[in-house]
Amino acid sequence: SCLVGSEMCIRDRLYPKPDDVPSIKADPMLKVAEMEALVTGYIALNTQHRYLSDVRVRQALDMAFDRQTHIEQLFGRGNALLAVNPYPPTVMGYNRDNRNPPRDLDKARALLREAGVPEGTELTLFTRNGGGPTNPNPRLSAEMLQSDLAKIGIKLNIRVMEWAEMLRRAKNGEHDLVSTGWAGDNGDPDNFLTPLLSCEAARNGENYARWCNKTFQALITEARQVIDPQQREALYIRALAVYDADRPWITMAHPKMFTAMRRNVEGYTISPLTNNNFATTLVK
């Protein structure tokens, strides 16, 4: 790596494993810039499958999920934000009234009983075989969720597979749950909501929750057609309230993005988008 050589080097968009950032920061020859990335890791719940079509069941699974422990084990303390909405707080229309439910195993079990879900019901989670920006350790993540759901009487079967196979099978709706994520490339809410949660994407896209909510769809369709930023923002806030009430995902994390560089580099500004701007970058 050029980071350990003598030349000027910038390693852009470093999504570290939990132990990477402290070691880079501790190196006297290096420095690290960081910012919130346009990234969300989440678990999509197949709303067209038995049991998961019931919002009470989706709420129960969400209540059983130990988010704080999950992201600290996966990303390390301070390297990711707890996700609430489908996109991070830096994106327009972030609904700050939305909340993840507090972890409550008793209430989760009660919701499952109310929905008629038998003790010991089996669900299958698809996850990838290698880590990435949205989840550095998919197997550990799956095992932690498996342990969480066992506490409310759900047996989670884990299916680990290649990324391409996982996406193909998830598009076919073969999963109950799928652990995945999304990296936005322009900072607009539509760049998250239409590909991941629209009715069209439920039919033939990347809406792995296979969730089609007419109220939500009408709001994001209108927001795409509105020019005024304040009106757009209000529409997205309303759309996210619908999303929050219906719980098609278990949101996990918004990982931070890190850029490592040698200490002789000055003036470089990290960007959450795909472009690099070296106009103000100097080597001293």
Role assignments for model-derived ranges:
Residues 22-37, 44-55, 89-107, 117, ...:
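Short, solvent-exposed loop/beta-turn-alpha elements that line the ligand-binding surface or hinge
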Residues 17-26, 48, 52-91, 137, ...:
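Periplasmic-binding protein-like
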Residues 16, 91, 113-186, 229, ...:
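Ligand/substrate-recognition segments at binding pockets and active sites
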Residues 7, 22, 43, 55, ...:
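Solvent-exposed, polar/charged alpha-helical surfaces in well-ordered, non-transmembrane soluble domains
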Residues 81-114, 132-140:
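Structural transition elements
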Residues 13-18, 35-39, 178-192:
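Ligand-binding clamshell of periplasmic/extracellular solute-binding protein-like
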Residues 2-10:
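Short, small-residue-biased leader/transition segments that mark boundaries at the very start
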Residues 14-15, 51-56, 64-65, 99-106, ...:
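Soluble non-cytosolic domains of exported or imported proteins
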